[in-house]
Every structure is written in C-alpha cells, then in structure tokens.
Amino acid sequence: MATVLLIGASRGIGLEMARQYRQDGWRVIGTARDDAGLARLRALDCEALRVDVADPASNSGLAWQLDGEKLDVAIYVAGVIDRADTTTPPTRETFDQLMHTNVMGAAMALPQTAPMLQEAGGVFAVISSVMGSLAQTQSGGSALYRISKAALNMWMRCAQFDHPKLCCVAFHPGWVQTDMGGAQAPLTPVQSAADLRQTLERVRAHRAQYQGAFLNHDGSPLPW
C-alpha cells in the first residue's frame, strides 16, 4: 500500500486530498495543529499527527513522529494569506506568520522527510501559488503572500540540487473555493485535489522530467 504524508491537511485542499487518497486505497498520514483538525482527519480513516507548522519546536518533531516510516509522496499543503499591498509597512506579526507558515514549515519538513522518501524514490511537493511567480506578477496586492510563495519556490528549486534522489515539485493549485480562495473561485476543492493527484501520478512515473519543476494543477509548466 502506497503512503502519502499531507502536512497541513485539516481543511480545504489538504483535507480533500486526504479523502481522495483514502478512497483510492492509499495509507494517509495527515498533520493538523488542533483537536478539531485531527478529528476531521481521523473521521476519514487517516492517521493524524499533531504538528503546528508555524511553531519551529512543534515542526522539528515531525521526523520523530514519523520514525521508521517509508513515504511515497509528501505534500506540504499548509498556507496563510495576507492581502495588504506595499503602500503600508507590514507588521512583524503578519510577516512572521506568513514566513513561518508558508516557508519555514516546508523548509523544516523537507529535510526531515527526505530520508523516508528516498527509499521509495518518492516525491516531495508543496502547494505554492502562481502569485509567487515573478514573471506573472501584474499587481502589488497580497505582497507578503507573493513574497512568501516566491521564497518557497526558491527553496524547492535549491532543494532539488541538494536532494538529487528526490523529485521536488512546486504546484499552483488553481483558484479554489476555500477559506483563502473564497466562494467566487472557479475551482472546487474536489476538482483541484483530483487534478493535483493526477499530475502527481505523472510526476511519479516520469520523475527525471519533473525534478525541480513549478507546475499548474493540470500539469502545465509555470514560469518562475
């Protein structure tokens, strides 16, 4: 049975991916930071681990909680947004929240899970955003969010060189009807999760082709 680790899977795209993977017979290990999130994962018959990705002390214990595991896929799904532009200075609290959740959490998770993934020739993926693409930036809105996703993309690009036995991939999930995306978004979590899973299967089948890639949810390449 294949095993997937979903980091930050208590709601939205992460929870839907957990549901779909379990439905297809995968073993799913999901993380959440609170009791409600853990309960939602367990209700889907997933193994649930308590990890607060924004807390380095909590995040540093991920490898210990996963001791002895072999993973086929690990996906960092956690993310938060701030919609302010650059006309006002960001607060330290907002800056730290975005950078800790969107960047540091993934940066701490990757080296902890890499040995578990390498044994299976696995994939480490992050849910990034096209808003982190320098080439496609057309406005200054959500500036800190954009910066955090650009930093996450660079971390993944660097990680591919440092972990050549892995396939490290960054994904744009689309504009999705989640708490972050809003009800007006064109994609449902079901559609986005299904697309991401289908694309991940192509990535697993052709790892060398996709190492260090930045992809749309449908598998099309995105400019950095």
Model-derived features with residue positions:
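Conserved N-terminal Rossmann-fold NAD(P)-binding element of oxidoreductases
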Residues: 4-8
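N-terminal Rossmann NAD(P)H-binding glycine-rich loop of SDR-like oxidoreductase domains
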Residues: 10, 14-20
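Conserved glycine-rich Rossmann-like NAD(P)H-binding loop of the short-chain dehydrogenase/reductase
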Residues: 24-39
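Rossmann-fold cofactor-recognition segment
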Residues: 43-57
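Conserved Rossmann-fold cofactor-binding substructure of NAD(P)-dependent oxidoreductases
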Residues: 53-69
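Catalytic loop of short-chain dehydrogenase/reductase
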Residues: 80, 84-99, 107-108, 120-161
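C-terminal helical subdomain
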Residues: 170-173, 182-224
